[in-house]
């Protein structure tokens, strides 16, 4: 019943393109956790291991009871690589495989289904600010339940270390754990507006950062060797467009793509701008503009197989939407 309510929530988004991209990261992490013995067969069979995406611009991801995980589009939109997203998902997965959720909930004396359900709905449907997020959680007891799901420092360190092993064994770049921490730390210093709720439930300490830095191979580059790919830049742009579907925001994407300075920026930045503009124009039913921008995106991504596939999927979406409008 609780899960059915989650799927009916207006903040829940079922987008095939984003879901495929996330699953392409998530499934190798699950396989790695199984291979390492972190994910016990009993837990594996009993839990859902499913990611639910929320149409929310805040930077957040969280583990929920029963093997469900929440992922805000805001997080997909700010990470610079699939490896950084993998580091967050591996961390959240490890909270569950190490039974942190069950240990925290066991401390709640009134762990009735409605209380847990209210906490889940409030977390997934968190809106544009902390006050609104708390308002979505039914009753003072449910707010207390959410507060108890703030992980201890010991749990955070354990999830970091287990998650690090899971993601590296799955083939993702280990440096992404550090670059993601750097991104969160810098954003926490610059923003105190509630846009990073992830940091409230996952306190980032200098000890955690130092621990992940110490785990890097000797002589490793301080930055990600893979960098931003065209494909990830396009998927991140999609997440940003879908998380802020207002008319003014959609029009801003078109203006960005028409900028004279766009040709002088790196290819991933160009791909993101063009992809976002095509999707925005499609949503605005400006199909002529969308088709023109799509031609530029097609040319830019022609030599990159994964990016070219994203372009073809976008072209099919444009054609389908235009056909439905006629």
For each feature predicted by the language model, list its residue ranges.
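Catalytic Zn2+-binding segment of zinc metalloproteases
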Residues: 80-83, 93-110
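Short alpha-helical catalytic segment bearing the HExxH-like zincin motif
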Residues: 70, 84-92, 96, 138
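Acidic helix-start/capping segments at beta-turn-to-alpha-helix junctions
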Residues: 13-32, 40-54, 110-116, 180-187
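Acidic/histidine metal-binding catalytic segments
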Residues: 105-117, 132-135, 171-181
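Membrane-active amphipathic alpha-helices enriched in small hydrophobic residues
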Residues: 113-128, 135-144
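Catalytic zinc-binding patch centered on the HExxH motif and its immediate surroundings
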Residues: 52-67
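Short pre-active-site segment immediately N-terminal to the catalytic Zn-binding motif
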Residues: 70-87, 149-154
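Extracytoplasmic and endomembrane cell-envelope/extracellular-matrix remodeling and assembly machinery
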Residues: 1, 12, 20, 38, ...
């Amino acid at each position: 019943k609780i899960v059915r309510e989650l799927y009916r929530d207006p903040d829940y988004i079922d987008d095939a393109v984003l879901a495929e991209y996330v699953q392409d990261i998530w499934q190798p992490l699950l396989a790695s956790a199984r291979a390492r013995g972190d994910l016990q067969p009993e837990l594996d069979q009993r839990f859902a291991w499913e990611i639910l995406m929320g149409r929310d611009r805040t930077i957040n991801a969280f583990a929920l009871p029963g093997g469900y995980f929440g992922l805000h589009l805001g997080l997909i939109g700010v990470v610079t690589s699939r490896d950084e997203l993998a580091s967050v998902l591996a961390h959240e997965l490890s909270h569950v495989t190490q039974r942190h959720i069950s240990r925290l909930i066991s401390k709640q004396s009134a762990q009735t289904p409605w209380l847990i359900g209210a906490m889940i709905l409030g977390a997934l449907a968190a809106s544009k600010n902390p006050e609104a997020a708390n308002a979505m959680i039914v009753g003072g007891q449910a707010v207390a339940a959410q507060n108890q799901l703030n992980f201890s420092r010991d749990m955070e360190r354990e999830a970091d270390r287990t998650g690090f092993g899971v993601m590296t064994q799955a083939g993702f770049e280990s440096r992404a754990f550090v670059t993601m921490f750097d991104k969160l730390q810098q954003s926490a210093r610059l923003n105190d507006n509630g846009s990073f709720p992830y940091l409230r439930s996952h306190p980032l300490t200098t000890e955690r950062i130092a621990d992940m830095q110490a785990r890097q191979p000797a002589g490793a580059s301080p930055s990600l060797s893979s960098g931003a790919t065209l494909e990830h830049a396009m998927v991140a742009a999609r997440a940003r467009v879908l998380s802020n579907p207002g008319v003014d925001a959609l029009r801003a994407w078109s203006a960005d793509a028409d900028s004279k300075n766009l040709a002088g920026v790196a290819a991933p930045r160009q791909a993101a701008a063009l992809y976002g503009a095509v999707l925005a124009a499609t949503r605005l039913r400006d199909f002529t503009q969308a088709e023109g921008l799509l031609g530029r995106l097609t040319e830019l991504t022609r030599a990159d197989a994964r990016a070219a596939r994203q372009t073809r999927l976008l072209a099919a979406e444009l054609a389908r939407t235009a056909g439905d409008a006629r």
